[in-house]
Structures are given as C-alpha cells and as structure tokens.
Regions:
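N-terminal cationic and glycine-rich segments that engage phosphates or anionic surfaces
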Residues: 2-110, 115-453
C-alpha cells in the first residue's frame, strides 16, 4: 500500500496543480499573507532615529545583529513593527509544553483532545502577550540607552511597547491562519520568508568583500562548497528513516481466510524536525539582543552576556548544543512521536513487532529504538547548527551565516513540498473515485427491465 502511494506521488506532476482548485487557493492565500508580513517589516516604530540605527546596525551586522536581523527578516535592523518577530510566541510555546509535562492539570488538558488543545493554545497566547510585553519594554529601554531614539521618555516606551506587542500578536495570527487555511506550517513559513529575504543582501555583501580583497578567493570557494554540502547533508538526513517491521496476523472473514500482511513503521532519524533549532535560537537570542542595543550603558551582567554568549563564543556554542539535544528528545517524545500512542494504534489494528508482545512491551521497544535513533538525530542537528558558526569565526566571514538558517530553509521547503504533493495526491484519488462512480451509474442505466408480453 505504501509503495503504491509513493508511486502515485512520484507520477503526480505540477501540471495537475491547475486542476486542484482548493490547493491553488491555499497557495495564493499563503502567498498573500506572507506578502503582508514582508510589507510590515518596512513600517518603522514611531520615534526611532533612522540614521543612528543604520550606523549602529552596520557595526553590529557581523555579530549578533546579523543573526537577529536574519531571524526577523530585517525588521529588527529597520526597527519595524515586527521587530520582535515570532520569537515570543515560540518561547511561550516552549514554556507551555514544558509545563504540560510537569503540571498535572495541564497534562490532563492535553489528554482531552481538541477541546483541551484549544485551551492550551489559549494559554500559549496569554504567555506570548506577557513575554512580548517584557521583551518590548526591555528593547525600548535599550534603544534609549543606545541613543537610537529621537525623543526618549515614557511616551516613547509606551508607543514602542504597544507597537511591538501588537506586531507580534498580528504575526501569531498570520501564522495560525496560514496553518489552518493555507499550505505548510505558518510559523515556520514566516521564519523561512524572513531568512530568504535577507539572503540577497548577505550575498551581495559577501561578494563585495571578495572584490575588495578583504576575503580571499579560497575562502569564497570554501563557503560556497560548505553551503552546498550543508544543504545536501540536511536533505539526506531529513529523508533518512529507520524502518521497523510490522506484522499483521491472518484474519478470517466469513468462510475465507486472508493471509497476514506486513508493512513498515517509518521512524525518522530526526523526528523533531527543525523545532529544536528554532527553540534553541529563540532562547539564546533574547538576552544578547537587549544587551546589544543597550550600547555602552549595559550592566556588568549584560556586558558579560554579550562577551560570552555572542555567536561563535565557546559558552554560546556549548549552551546551543545542550539546548538542541534537550529539545530534540523533549519534542520528539512529547509531540512528534509518542511510543504509547503508537503502540496502542498498532494493537488496535492487530499489528505487532515480531518477537515483541503488543501493548506495553511494544511501547518500551519503540522508546528504546527512538532513543537510539535520536542519538544520531540530535548529533546531526547540533553539527549543522554549530559547525558553520565555528568556521565563520575562523575565516572572519563579514556577514552572518548560520547552519540554523540553512536547516530551517531546507526543512521548511521539504515539508511544504510534501504537503503540496499530499494535496495533489488527494485530488488524484478524488478524481479516480468520481470516475468509478460515473462508470457505475452508466452500467446501471444500461440495464433495462424485461419487456412484458
């Protein structure tokens, strides 16, 4: 059955997109909302000194400024209304998901199905407002400390706070609308578009540095090879599977006995996808962002954070690896692959792993297999996210290039294409069903009652 579906998906061409009206509408809806997001990144927060901000971001572009600007689609560099990006929502999601594993009442809500999930989503929105408020106020104070505003004071702080919080909530709504009525995951697509939008400027800066002689031709070739190799490696690892053999017993229907079939349970090497990298980046970006915009007025704690937790610093890399590994395991076993639920589904379908008893023993075996697979998956995530950071520091590349960005772009692209193919496949199945129904009706019409004598 799986091979038949794969063959049909392979034979599905993009020419059939014109016939899939629902899919075409979803794609157009998604593109329209993403264009709205991009336009919003160019609307500035009131009270910002544009010239001072441009000078500041040119100096900060090589370090954390370039990293944050990449993740916000350049909105932070222009201090647009979407300067906080979607990161407060991601941070709130992290906190709520952690609490659902520790607080019994939230864990019970999680088990209540759609209604419980709706309540958890509401808590996530409340958390987003709270985090965005704290981050927006901290950013407003930091902008004042860095002499990047035209007129400092209470009015600017409140204006900045309301504008940035409103921008984040609007982005959250855009992401939810894309997920529900568009194609792909809305939050991931917003981050994806923000990264892609900054790539042309980064490439122009990179090649301009090569023409001026500040970067040697060998480094340019090395960076290009590294980017291509990283993309190929990410594609390979994201498609890598551990196939678990599943056996189905013989079954009797009436007087007929059907032989038991067999299939495979695909377990991805990286079941959590790009989520651990996004979570880790969102947690590490906040304190350093505030300390960066504070200029020379930072406290000793913020100065220490900026010195030790900037991209490429040893402590930054160690914490980055630790957070990625933690969320790779946490997100896999709490969201993307739950061994208990998978074991129950197999038991209900009379499927079993050869040599393993159905039920609890199967769940334990699945957990054992996924734990072993995740060792490779988490190492892959950490390597892709951290190695480009180390190489960028060694070769003094004058713009931000992170493996996290490449990972997000490749993973979101593959996921979106897969969803488009799924919609096209469903459209093809609907066409086959309609044709079979029409043929059935034609045959019934040909049958006439015998003429009376």
């Amino acid at each position: 059955m799986v091979s038949a579906v794969e063959n049909m998906a392979a034979n599905t061409t993009w020419a059939s997109l014109g016939k899939a009206t629902d899919l075409r509408n979803r794609i157009l809806f998604t593109l329209a909302l993403l264009i709205v997001y991009r336009l919003g990144t160019f609307i500035p927060v009131p009270g910002i000194d544009g010239a001072a901000l441009r000078d500041f971001m040119e100096n900060a572009g090589q370090g954390i400024g370039g990293m944050v600007s990449m993740f916000t689609g350049g909105a932070l560099g222009r201090m647009g209304i979407f300067a906080l990006g979607i990161m407060p929502y991601i941070s709130a999601s992290i906190i709520v998901q952690l609490m659902t594993s520790m607080v019994p009442s939230l864990e019970q809500l999680k088990k209540e199905g759609a209604q419980g999930q709706k309540k958890i989503n509401q808590y996530t929105r409340y958390g987003t407002v709270a985090l965005a408020t704290v981050q927006a106020y901290g950013l407003a104070v930091s902008l004042e400390s860095g002499d990047l505003v035209t007129e400092a004071g209470f009015y600017f702080r409140m204006t900045c706070l309301i504008t940035l919080v409103g921008g984040t909530m609007f982005l959250m709504w855009l992401g939810e609308q894309i997920t529900a009525r568009g194609i792909g995951n809305g939050i991931s697509l917003i981050i994806f578009v923000g990264i892609i939008a900054e790539v042309p400027a980064a490439l122009a800066q990179f090649f301009a540095s090569g023409r001026s002689g500040s970067i040697s031709p060998a480094v340019i070739v090395g960076v290009i090879v590294m980017v291509i190799a990283t993309i190929a490696f990410v594609v390979f690892m994201e498609r890598a599977l551990r196939k678990l053999h599943i056996q189905y017993p013989r079954r009797q229907v009436g007087m007929k006995v059907y032989d038991g079939g067999s299939s495979h349970l695909p377990i991805k090497v990286n079941p959590a996808g790009v989520i651990p990298a996004i979570f880790a980046s969102s947690l590490l970006l906040l304190p350093v962002t505030i300390s960066t915009f504070s200029g020379g007025s930072t406290s000793p704690v913020m100065s220490w954070l900026l010195a030790n937790f900037g991209p490429g610093q040893p402590l930054y890399l160690l914490f980055f690896i630790a957070i990625i590994v933690f969320f790779a395991y946490f997100y896999t076993f709490n969201v993307s692959f739950k061994p208990d639920e998978v074991a129950d589904n197999l038991k209900n379908q009379n499927g079993f792993v050869p040599g393993i008893r159905p039920g609890k023993k199967t769940a334990e075996y699945l957990e054992y297999v996924v734990n072993r697979v995740l060792v490779l998956g988490s190492m892959y995530l950490a390597a892709v996210c951290v190695l480009p950071e180390i190489l960028r520091g060694q070769f003094a590349i004058p713009f931000y290039f992170g493996g996290t960005s490449v990972l997000i772009v490749v993973s979101v692209t593959m996921d979106t294409i897969q969803q488009v193919q799924s919609h096209l496949l469903a459209q093809q199945y609907e066409g086959l069903i309609e044709k079979s129904n029409l043929r059935g009706k034609g045959k019934t019409r040909k049958k006439r009652s015998p003429a009376r004598k």
